């Protein structure tokens, strides 16, 4: 019996010397997440060979065979592979074995000179490679392995024995991608390293490996039964993980093996929900084409064919592929597995009960509107009863914000008083939009300020002297000084303006003259004024 040492239960470490693409990190090859493991590893499009992926084991192993799947959506990119091995010293390996039984261990990758070349292959239109060790023999308690029959599409290559430690005492395995076809992208779909613990491992490590291997494999399968061509398509976790996982790796591999290559996007390797036929004859998904166009636009280039680089013209444009779209939809309807995340598949849980999601938000909006309405009504009532129009040291933006808040409160009050028709709501929204737009114009602001000041002056005079206001009616054409009749405006005045307790305004020179004469009184209404009651106002 041999075990797949790349399973996450054995805590391997993996490293790549080049940058990987987003979502296709090298850690996907040994990840516990089945979705990530199905994505595999892929470098960025601008990375060129050589590329080295190093797998480090927490204990020394004896390699039986190495299976590498280089499938990239039907295109053969990788054409040259090399395999290297490295062995640690006995002291370091013994420490790693002791740490592996208690917790994870961080192994260090040796230098380039420490690796030994044990295998090399050149591919011609093949995507599966199997490196096998001819002299491998299973030791007790591991049972002898059966002969594995390889498929004709799989390239078989024997490993070279470069010494006693090159294949039987391996701590690090390095896979090198040396050549790719054309401008292809270097990638590894799946990686499996089958073997057993080395002879130098302690009995405790051997028992732990045997126990984990027995728990990982299904009980109805023999432990030494091989599979072809990739042997770890079963769920590597125990029964508890299989109960929580809605889609096993075996089901996923069956689906992926049944998916025709023409249904997969050659760039993202996903099923295309909306295939587009390019002028070059290639077919990609519409979302992939949009991402390519955005990437080109970021560099100031016009949309072009991702495969040829030729810009689109009115005569050569990407077109929908309705016949392929119909075939893809039929395939997705016939091959549906619960829990598998296929591109374009509708997610039913999020669309089950839309009312449950929308109703609470509507309720919160209604409560917030009522709260703001009551708050604005209370603020407007208290401000009209206790404070004048201008507050001390109140700037112009603050006054505009308070005015907008009061208008919003009055609008909410009108809406809550009774049923409002659509025409009334439209008129109110247009009026608010017009007011907010014209609020920055000087002529509109000056006219609005004059009307507000007139209303405020009359209201304050009526509150303080109702009898005198009725006896001496007065029409104010605009904010002006009560003594020298100088007009005030937020865009014309440069001098400070002061307000008397009676509500009338004075400029700075007139206020200085009033302070020299005792007793101090208002010129307009002849009310006595004290210096501490005079407030400075801002338009």
From Swiss-Prot:
Pathway: Protein modification; protein ubiquitination. SMART domains: Ubox. The keyword Transferase applies. GO terms for biological process: protein polyubiquitination. Residues 226-249, 359-399, 456-479 are annotated as: Disordered. It is found in: Nucleus. Residues 258-338 form the U-box domain. Interacts with UBE2L3. Interacts with VCP. This is RING finger protein 37.
């Amino acid at each position: 019996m041999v075990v797949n040492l790349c399973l996450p239960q054995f805590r391997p470490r993996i490293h790549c010397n080049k940058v990987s693409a987003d979502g296709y990190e090298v850690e996907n090859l040994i990840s516990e997440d089945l979705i990530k493991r199905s994505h595999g590893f892929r470098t960025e499009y601008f990375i060129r060979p050589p590329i080295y992926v190093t797998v480090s084991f927490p204990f020394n192993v004896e390699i039986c065979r190495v299976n590498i799947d280089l499938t990239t959506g039907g295109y053969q990119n990788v054409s040259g592979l090399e395999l290297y091995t490295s062995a640690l010293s006995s002291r370091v390996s013994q420490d790693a074995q002791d740490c592996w039984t208690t917790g994870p261990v961080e192994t260090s990758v040796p230098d380039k000179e420490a690796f030994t070349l044990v295998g090399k292959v050149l591919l011609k239109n093949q995507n599966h490679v199997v490196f096998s060790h001819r002299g491998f023999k299973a030791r007790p308690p591991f049972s002898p392995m059966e002969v594995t029959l390889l498929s004709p599409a799989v390239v078989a290559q024997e490993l070279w024995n470069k010494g006693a430690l090159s294949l039987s005492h391996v701590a690090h395995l390095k896979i090198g991608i040396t050549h790719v076809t054309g401008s292809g992208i270097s990638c590894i779909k799946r990686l499996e390293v089958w073997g057993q613990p080395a002879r130098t491992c302690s009995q405790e490590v051997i028992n732990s490996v045997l126990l984990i291997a027995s728990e990982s494999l299904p009980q109805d399968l023999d432990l030494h039964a091989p599979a072809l061509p990739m042997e770890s398509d079963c769920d590597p976790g125990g029964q508890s993980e299989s109960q929580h996982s809605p889609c096993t790796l075996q089901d996923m591999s069956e689906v992926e093996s049944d998916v025709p290559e023409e249904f997969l996007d050659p760039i993202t390797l996903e099923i295309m929900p909306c295939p587009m036929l390019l002028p070059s004859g290639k077919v990609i998904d519409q979302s992939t084409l949009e991402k390519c166009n955005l990437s080109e636009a970021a560099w100031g280039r016009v949309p072009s064919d991702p495969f040829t680089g030729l810009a689109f013209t009115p005569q050569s444009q990407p077109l929908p592929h309705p016949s392929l779209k119909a075939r893809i939809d039929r395939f997705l309807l016939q091959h549906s597995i619960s829990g598998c995340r296929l591109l374009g598949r509708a997610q039913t849980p999020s669309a089950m009960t839309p009312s449950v999601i929308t109703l609470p938000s509507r309720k919160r909006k209604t409560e917030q509107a009522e709260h703001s309405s009551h708050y604005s009504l209370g603020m407007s009532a208290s401000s009209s009863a206790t404070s004048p129009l201008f507050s001390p040291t109140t700037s112009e933006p603050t006054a505009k914000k308070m005015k907008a808040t009061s208008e919003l409160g009055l609008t909410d009050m009108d809406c809550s008083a009774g049923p409002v028709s659509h025409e009334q709501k439209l008129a109110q929204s247009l009026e608010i939009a017009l007011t907010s737009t014209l609020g920055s114009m000087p002529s509109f602001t000056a006219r609005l300020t004059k009307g507000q000041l007139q209303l405020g002056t009359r209201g304050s005079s009526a509150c303080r002297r109702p009898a005198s206001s009725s006896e001496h009616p007065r029409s104010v054409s605009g904010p002006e000084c009560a003594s020298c009749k100088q007009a005030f405006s937020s865009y014309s005045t440069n001098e400070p303006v002061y307000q008397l307790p009676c509500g009338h305004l004075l400029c700075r020179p007139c206020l200085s003259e009033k302070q020299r004469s005792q007793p101090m009184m208002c010129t307009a209404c002849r009310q006595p004024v004290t210096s501490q009651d005079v407030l400075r106002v801002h338009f």
